[in-house]
Design a protein with these regions (language model features):
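Collagenous Gly-X-Y triple-helix signature in extracellular proteins
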Residues: 51-300
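Extracellular repetitive beta-rich solenoid segments
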Residues: 2-49
Length: 300
């Protein structure tokens, strides 16, 4: 039996087909006559321009992956393949906002290679900066016997962040929790921290090892808000390697406020450190207040 020409049927009379394979043929008119093209070739040509435009966003490097917010759940543990991708600096299938849920805490990707090429000892290790969605617990910057806010001398920023009880002891619980969740993969790197205060301003600092530390205003907001600045005569010791906003907070600002007040490490006055208020605004508070501990750390 001879085949019936397609031209004897209307398009609406043809059998519907929704699962074409690469070898399927599509009739196409090039302006001179009717020809054929495979589905594979048609598809490739149709997306050619789009693929060229989005390709840079899919490159396997920190710059490309810092530019995309995804927010995908990555499960309850970092896989061997994921650690390998971090180590290689390709960050395959890892994007800003992705998170692991470990011990009831969402640990969310905030940046890729944020500290690379910084520090008095150069950071050359590829890494991912992680920030928990919630505060791990509450603690004071300066401890009191009551465990809560007290007036007067209890509120001091003497010694800066390095001299605070938060730095010296109150972060230990967070370090234990985080090192258990990411065993053997918490990166030790070098950052510059305040260790002296004069007239309510940071007046000195030093390079320190960092594994788990409070964030600073620049990491959260993209700039200083309450931190004292140069007035033309006095220049506060605001030296830091964290000069830019974490991509997590840049792409999704709602991640800054978690409906709790949590500490930042910046010295604001002789008695107050910076914090993020429960209502979402930038704030500062007396050192003896017990506020949330929401630290940042790197895995590699």
């Amino acid at each position: 039996m001879s085949a019936i020409s397609i031209e004897t049927k209307k398009v609406t009379e043809l059998t519907a087909f929704t699962t074409p394979t690469d070898s399927c043929l599509i009739p196409i008119h090039d302006g001179t006559s009717l020809k054929k093209i495979t589905f594979a070739n048609f598809r490739a040509k149709a997306v050619e321009g789009t693929e060229a435009k989005i390709a840079p966003l899919l490159f396997n490097n920190a710059g490309a992956h810092n530019a995309i917010y995804r927010g995908k759940s990555l499960g309850s543990t970092v896989t061997t393949a994921q650690y390998a991708a971090i180590k290689a600096g390709t960050f395959d299938d890892l994007y800003i906002g992705d998170y692991w849920t470990i011990g009831g805490v969402n640990y969310r990707i905030a940046a890729f290679d944020y500290y690379l090429n910084s520090g008095d000892t150069n950071c050359t290790t590829h890494h991912v900066v992680i920030v928990p969605d919630t505060c791990l617990y509450n603690a004071q910057m300066h401890n009191t016997s009551s465990g809560g806010w007290e007036s007067g001398a209890a509120n001091t920023t003497a010694g800066g962040y390095v001299g605070s009880d938060m730095y010296k002891s109150n972060l230990e619980q967070a370090k234990t929790t985080i090192k258990s969740a990411f065993s053997g993969h918490v990166l030790k790197h070098r950052i510059y921290l305040t260790n002296a205060v004069a007239n309510g301003r940071a007046s000195g600092g030093a390079w320190c090892d960092s594994e788990v530390d409070l964030m600073c205003e620049q990491m959260v907001y993209g700039s200083g808000i309450f931190s004292p600045v140069s007035d033309g005569s006095n220049v506060p010791a605001n030296y830091r390697v964290e000069k830019s906003q974490l991509p997590l907070f840049q792409h999704e600002p709602s991640r800054i406020c978690n409906r709790a007040t949590w500490w930042l490490r910046d010295v604001i006055t002789a008695s107050s450190f910076a914090n993020v208020d429960t209502n979402g605004y930038a704030d500062c508070g007396n050192a003896s207040y017990s506020c949330g501990v929401r630290p940042a750390f790197c895995i590699s």
